[in-house]
């Protein structure tokens, strides 16, 4: 029985706003409970790959992933934005590095805690539930940056990262480079050079204790994809500057290392007073 379909449209919209299919999939995987996570874009679907995306061993990570984690280790404490099930947090903990995780998903945070990492918070990355100037680094890897939806939205998110970090902080963010990407799941083209979009939603299905099939449907997610050149444009009016760009040869996915100029952060703070 599909519980999501049997409710009135208004109720379904409210349920989707509150739904947490990705977090539930993480928690179910951690507890070795059955369930299936899929990405959906209209009739097209793609497997959610919960184990490989959120529970993979560090031995399987590529060099750019490890390099980004190592570079931030010297800037502790680190704020891991969109920490998910806590894989990167656990890596830092194993290396004696202080970090705190934040995720919008209550079930993802619960999963990270049950895996042994207690310093995790439920919160919105656009209004982070942490004090000003509290961290030496921000790690936001999982293409969350694209949820800004536009270059202006990314710029506002970077200002929030600036608020919670100390002078001369470092941030690592990631995205897919549209100049090297013709198609991916949920892909939407854009006439502007170095800009594209992804749109899809997540669904988690499981069998209930009553033997019925339950499906949790999340809201539609819109990601802005931008090239490193476009990311530099987004940082132009923020304290951040793009330093190194890390990626495997020919890969569309990249990580950008951002360095913070303290004077610009103070200028924004004074404007808001």
What are these model-predicted stretches?
Residues 1-40:
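N-terminal auxiliary segments of SAM/dcSAM-dependent transferases
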Residues 75-84:
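Conserved class I S-adenosyl-L-methionine
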Residues 105-107:
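Conserved SAM/SAH-binding beta-strand->alpha-helix loop
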Residues 116-128:
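Conserved SAM-binding strand-loop segment of SAM-dependent methyltransferases
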Residues 126-138:
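A short acidic, Gly/Pro-enriched loop at the edge of an enzyme's catalytic core
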Residues 136-155:
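A short SAM/SAH-binding and catalytic strip from SAM-dependent methyltransferases
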Residues 153-167:
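A short glycine-rich, Lys/Arg-flanked "PGG" loop and its adjoining helix->strand segment in the class I
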Residues 172-226:
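SAM-dependent methyltransferase
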